[in-house]
Amino acid sequence: MSKKYDVAIVGATGAVGETLISILDQRNFPINNLYPLASKRSAGSKVRCQGKSWTVEDLDTFDFSKVQIGVFSAGSDISEKYAPVAASKGCVVIDNTSHFRRDEDIPLVIPEVNPHAIANYTNRNIIANPNCSTIQMLVALKPIYDAVGIDRINVATYQAVSGSGKEAITELTNQTANLLNGKDVEVEVYTKQIAFNAIPHIDTFQENGYTREEMKMVWETQKIFEDENLLVNPTAVRIPVVYGHSEAVHIETKEKISANDARKLLEKADGIIVMDERSDGGYATPFIEATNNDATYVSRIREDISHEKGLNLWVVADNIRKGAALNTVQIAEILIRDYLA
């Protein structure tokens, strides 16, 4: 019998936590015991995985020495407090928050891009999961980066409200219903009404005028590609879509590559579906294609008419699946295959 593992899911009742448990089930991850963890308020509720019912336990009193793998998806403050405790008990932590991403001794991993970095988990027994917008962009750019190099990335993101949690989904649906029925809307999660709107502001503003979400894409891209000279210029926008982030990506390559050659590279790459027909509907969208699917979709591949070595791409993925939960499970799969077996 193949080895099975005891796994803790911190934030098990949140949007990402619920999807994590679903993906562990779908991919038949070798679970011995599953420990869904949440706040005391959620303790006692049940989740189902692999044909069994598992009771949600109180994170505050949980003994992490009982598990080999702990997945954290409950916010940076929770990870800051509990992840080092879990790691000190021999549990390998895979953290879905931003808390550890910039730590030099913590590997920041996208399995299709830099799986070799997982080996460095032994530094602190912690592996960081990148930001959702970074993950899909780098999955799409890795084959091109390896083939011809990239000097600069310009990207505008169009990000779904589920990236802000369940409360944001509720706010969007309530605002939409109210507006369609001629009622006033309440604004709590976002700085302005999100229904029928676009908000060019995700996370806090920095001194340089960029938001922290935008700077995450800069820092994380350079760390994952191990290339401090790679220039990244992002604009992050929240739009009234429930699931699926979209990105308009423009790159300047070191060597010229045609759209056709780029398309061939992407078609052969793991985790990518190229949907690039130059006709009505011949492109991927967040709701129709990406939602509830694991792939990163790449469309609108074309050479930049304003730059000799420029290339444009439209990149779409489910932000809760590939942007968080799936990427985490893929890391765990490599971890048990190559390091914990």
Annotate each predicted stretch with a short phrase:
Residues 1-194, 230-231, 264, 281, ...:
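N-terminal Rossmann-like NAD(P) cofactor-binding subdomain of oxidoreductases
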Residues 11, 185, 189, 205-212, ...:
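A short glycine-/small-residue-rich loop at the edge of a beta-strand within enzyme catalytic domains
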Residues 21, 218-222, 263, 267:
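Generic solvent-exposed, charged/amphipathic alpha-helical segments
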Residues 40-42, 132-133, 157-164, 198-205, ...:
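Glycine-rich beta-alpha junction loops
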Residues 121-128, 197-208, 313-315:
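Helix-loop-beta segment of a Rossmann-like dinucleotide-binding subdomain
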Residues 230-341:
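C-terminal active-site/capping subdomain that shapes the small-molecule cofactor and substrate pocket
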